[in-house]
Amino acid sequence: MQSNELKSLLETAFPGAKVHVASPDDVHFQAQIVTEAFVGKPTLARHRMVYAVLGERMGGEVHALSLRTLTPQEAEAN
């Protein structure tokens, strides 16, 4: 899977989100997702939301994924 494909999946799953995806090899990915959908949710719940989108791709097309999941307010503060 290429970075732009992963980005598109995440943008579809989280409408209005700001998504940045990087990968040195199209197997190991780093993603930052900023969305209102994360408001009021702890980090673990946010990550589960992302993994639910990826489903069976995790461990296959996506071997490793480093996540940074933020609300818009958290992103502004950083």
Tell me what each language-model feature is.
Residues 14-30:
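Short edge beta-strands and adjacent turn/loop segments
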Residues 44-78:
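C-terminal structural segments of small proteins and small subunits
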Residues 1-17:
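N-proximal, solvent-exposed amphipathic alpha-helical segments enriched in charged/polar residues
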Residues 29-33, 75-78:
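Short, solvent-exposed polar/charged micro-motifs at secondary-structure junctions
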Residues 32-45:
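A short interface-forming secondary-structure element
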Residues 22, 34, 68-70:
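Solvent-exposed beta-strand sheet faces enriched in polar/charged residues
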Residues 26-28, 38, 72:
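Short active-site-proximal "capping" loops at secondary-structure junctions
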